[in-house]
Amino acid sequence: MTKIENCKSCLPTENEVEEEALSGVTFLGRVFKVARCERPVFTYMSIILFLVSYIYSVSRDMKDAIIIERLDPASIPYLKVLVVLPVNICIVFSIQKILINTSVSKVFSIMCVMFGIYFCLYGTVLMSFRHIFELNEFLIRDWFADDKMVFMGLQWTIALALPVNSWTSSLMYLSAEIWGTVVFQFLFFALSNEIYTQKQSLRFIPLFLVFGNVALIVSGFSMKFIKYVSEQGSYEFTLFFRKLVFVLMGICSFVIYLIHRYFEDNIAHKPLFVTSEASYKQKTKSKIGFMEAMQTMASSRLVLAISFVVIAYSVSVNMVEASFKTCMSQYALQKGAQADFHVMGVQSDIQLAVGALSIILLLSSFPALIRDKGFLYVAFVPPIFCIFGMASVFGMAALNNSARGNRTLLGFVSIGENLWLEQLLGAIIVTGFKILKYSAVDVSKEALSMRINPAYRARFKGIYDGVCGKLGKAIGSGITNMQNVFYNSSDVRKAAISSLTIVTVITACWGFAVRYLAGKYDKSTHSNTDIDIDLINVDPMEKDADDL
């Protein structure tokens, strides 16, 4: 007997480890379903995800504050469509090509180092010398002062001009989005799929999301501290403190790299148990281009329905956030507060609420409702919430615009402007959307994914997880941009009635898609077979299946 065979004979089987993980007698044991031998491999990955999520949460709120301070809320949709979407697609597809000959682990390490260098350079160089790198930051605002462009019908172009003039702020917005998409959503979970078996993934992924939401809570308190320090200090001290925040994010990126390298060298590849023949590690990679992804999506009604659900959610969230962020900026001006400080305070409150409530839902029996009650009980919650949420946000925006005398599609009786109430409703609805993202949209989507034949699963997930989320945001931003052009304004709240109409139509289609998916899911579970992917054209998919 060789040394390796002797070592394996001392290891428990995967089923024995699974039984130990599921047999917790204490509260923590029942919540954190992790066997004793799995604790190191789970703990290090949880720490990595915590730091990745913390950087993403802080950078996301910092970028929103910087954009509202130096640019305009109406600039965000243009950045999403013209900058973030194409750059994100290019980076993701480039990484997929690199992964043909390179491991996910190496790419993850490289990205952490690159972002670490970038964050440090941004805090020390770009923020210190942006007056040299950029044109006069007041140049564009002077062009648009005194409503000169309103009479020319070009007021909406300020949202395009400001990101070009203040390009360092646009770069910060782009980098925060790329960190969230590439490092957080793509590479980390691709790395976990290479390390864990399928049974481990089913237990660990919800727990990883818990640690991600703990990071969200910590970042919420961090943003409150940043806001407090910024309000108390002078302009020079506030600028120095913000530089320090970016440098600390860079240091955190390097810490992630060091923890990951130690984990890879000493823990990740040590055998924990004897893997059963029925189990396998999820190493399948989805190597698809954009056009190929669209063609594959169009060949299956099931994938079209799942993709539409993802797109509908992203469009709805994007449109309500555009209105909400504009309202925050307007309310800050109304009460004489500095816009970036005000945004930090509101965003930190949202983070705390989302993190705490998401953890409660993820640790409760809510994710198991699909199994116990049925698919519709979970999947139908987001579109129902969307209808009431959009009616609240856009309805209040329409009333406030009427009170100010701004033209909308329908006339309303002036009842007095109440931006505080509009902001409060917006914060509640945005919080609800983000909570439902973790606890309902993702849970129902993953339940469907687990019923798809493994031969197609990786390719289909590459479509609705890798492409459709950003595509939905781009569509929502495009709708916002077109409405700004139509109303000759940078305030999308003037289009509240048309926004409500568009989202209502999208949500109705969302509901029909959920009902269709529920029927397919229930049929699959009752017959205990793979879900019917409902092919439109069988021959191309049969060929793809043979290739797989």
Curated annotation (Swiss-Prot):
Protein's membrane topology: Multi-pass membrane protein
Sites where a glycan is attached: N101, N400, N406, N488
Keyword Cell membrane: yes
Cellular compartment(s): Cell membrane
Pfam families on file: TLC
Keyword tags: ATP-binding, Cell membrane, Glycoprotein, Membrane, Nucleotide-binding, Transmembrane, Transmembrane helix, Transport
TM regions (residue ranges): 39-59, 75-95, 107-127, 149-169, 171-191, 204-224, 239-259, 302-322, 350-370, 374-394, 410-430, 494-514
Major localization class: membrane
GO molecular function list: ATP binding; ATP:ADP antiporter activity
GO CC terms of this entry: plasma membrane
Family that this chain belongs to: Belongs to the ADP/ATP translocase tlc family.
Function: ATP transporter involved in the uptake of ATP from the host cell cytoplasm. Provides the microsporidian cell with host ATP in exchange for ADP. This is an obligate exchange system. This energy acquiring activity is an important component of microsporidian parasitism.
Name of protein: ADP,ATP carrier protein 1
This protein's encoding gene: ANC1
